[in-house]
């Protein structure tokens, strides 16, 4: 049996202290795994792929890359919308997450990324001739925003322990 002052029973880091103080567990989870964390990889991958596709189109001029870019940008946008819906659910349902400033920074960066992704996909739907330079610029901007959103999302997990535990409400 552990004593009151035993190191094994006492939190040893700021993250552990914050986990005890705030409820920052996941409220939107599947078999104990936060759904938002499982979903965010897809829009990130599609945003980066769209930038690569645009660079290939710029380099080769092959119309094949126009169609691939349309699909990639569309998947980036729609998978981003899906991840955003789940992330917004976490933000609204878990008080401890709402209280963290980093949560709001991540949310704003992610919403900006989804808006840029939507503009990028919409541009490709309407005017394929505008891919160079506007689509390429939007793809580059979206890739930069992936970095900002990912940085703030990582801070939530590694600095604040968000999503590490299931919410006690479950």
Task: Go through each PLM region and give its residues.
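Polytopic transmembrane helical bundles with strong interfacial aromatic enrichment
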Residues: 2-60, 67-170
């Amino acid at each position: 049996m552990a004593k009151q002052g035993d190191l094994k029973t006492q939190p040893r880091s700021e993250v552990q202290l914050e986990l005890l103080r705030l409820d920052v567990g996941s409220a939107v989870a599947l078999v104990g795994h936060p759904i938002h964390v499982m979903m965010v990889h897809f829009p990130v991958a599609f945003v980066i792929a769209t930038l690569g596709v645009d660079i290939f189109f710029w380099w080769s001029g092959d119309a094949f890359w126009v169609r691939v870019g349309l699909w990639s940008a569309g998947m980036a946008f729609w998978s981003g919308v899906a991840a955003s819906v789940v992330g917004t659910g976490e933000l609204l349902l878990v008080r401890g997450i709402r209280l963290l400033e980093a949560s709001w920074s991540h949310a704003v960066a992610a919403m900006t990324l989804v808006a840029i992704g939507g503009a990028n996909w919409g541009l490709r739907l309407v005017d394929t001739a505008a891919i160079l330079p506007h689509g390429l610029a939007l793809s580059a901007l979206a890739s930069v925003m992936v970095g900002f959103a990912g940085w703030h999302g990582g801070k939530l997990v590694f600095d604040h322990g968000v999503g590490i535990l299931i919410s006690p409400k479950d």
